[in-house]
Amino acid sequence: MPDPLSPAQRHTCMSHIRSTGTKPEMQLRKELFRLGYRYRINKKRLPGSPDIVLAKYSTCIFVNGCFWHGHMDCRYATRPKTNAQFWRTKIENNRERDLKDYTFLESLGWRVIVVWECELKKDRIDATIASVRKQLDANRESCLAELADRRKRREEWQAEIRRRKERSEEIQVNVKIH
């Protein structure tokens, strides 16, 4: 079925679709801020430019639109009947790109939380916020444990360097005596 809009009309329609500052994203950001979480938004230096970045928790949050990111079995993710092949390819490419970005972020040590647009509807938002909060708190505990482990390894490494330095000085003293 051909597109009922002219290319100029379609361009105008598509240019009004926002990629940042969407209503679902703003809802989640507002709730996180209210709960005391502080974050950065749309961090361009990270793969996929996450919508919300909580560095303290080593966590990136993506707020995905059900349609654009192909949320499976979601009533908001129905594909248009016109230009069906284009939309199938577009959404599949989006899903593949998202998976690649999430995997890369995780390989860099980030934890990834994906929140779907439908999870931020009135009847589900409280449960979604509670779930995100639970994940963030778990991530914080994990981050604190990692920091403690790093601190311990750094102290052990510094102690080893001190021992080597002392041995080196002892050897130099012994060489001077003989």
Label every model-predicted segment.
Residues 1-114, 118-178:
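Nucleic-acid endo/exonuclease domains
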